[in-house]
């Protein structure tokens, strides 16, 4: 980014009374990984599992082939743990300074929260929420990774579901509404 563009951005942020950041695959790319929809990663996954990620990462596959789903989930989404990038840390600093009011993100790795942001809307959920479909108990990534086969709830023994929106799932309407409210309040959107 040129010095002129940086100066314009700085002025826009300083003059803003309500700033919202919209984050997605760009932040993920900055962390050194590609999303499942990137052409190179999708091809590598299809070569490895014999099925495209567009089918592997669906509610139908999770329900019909939970063992295979969790092999894919643990290998492709939980290993290695993706670390927050400079963007996530910079957004947290802006929030602490009072120049950023909200982060709306489509990534599922809690990058903004783990970078230090407090007011974050995770549109597609997060891999850090793995809940029992029966009692609702939340399970850590470490627990999911430690399970040899299909992870079952430590409390009641029922199946665990990742707290993410799979391909084809509807995004929670309450999160959409909350995001719209935040964007309406904003006089500056950072993309």
Predicted segments, located by residue:
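Conserved catalytic core of sirtuin-type NAD+-dependent deacylases
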Residues: 1-191
């Amino acid at each position: 980014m040129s010095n002129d563009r940086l100066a314009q951005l700085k002025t826009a942020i300083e003059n803003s009374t309500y700033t919202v950041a919209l984050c997605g695959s760009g932040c993920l790319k900055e962390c050194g990984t590609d999303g499942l929809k990137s052409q190179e990663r999708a091809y590598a996954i299809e070569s490895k599992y014999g099925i495209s990620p567009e089918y592997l990462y669906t509610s139908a596959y999770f329900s019909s082939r939970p063992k295979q789903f969790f092999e894919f989930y643990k290998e492709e989404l939980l290993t290695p743990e993706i670390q927050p990038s400079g963007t996530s840390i910079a957004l947290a600093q802006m929030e602490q300074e009072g120049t950023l009011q909200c982060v709306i993100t489509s990534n599922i790795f809690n990058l903004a929260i783990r970078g230090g942001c407090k007011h974050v809307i995770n549109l597609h959920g997060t891999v850090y929420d793995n809940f029992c479909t029966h009692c609702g108990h939340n399970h850590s990534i470490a627990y999911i990774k430690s399970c040899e086969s299909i992870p079952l709830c430590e409390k009641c023994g029922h199946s665990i579901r990742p707290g993410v929106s799979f391909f084809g799932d509807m995004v929670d309407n309450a999160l959409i509404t909350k995001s719209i409210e935040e964007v309406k309040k904003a006089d500056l959107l950072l993309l």
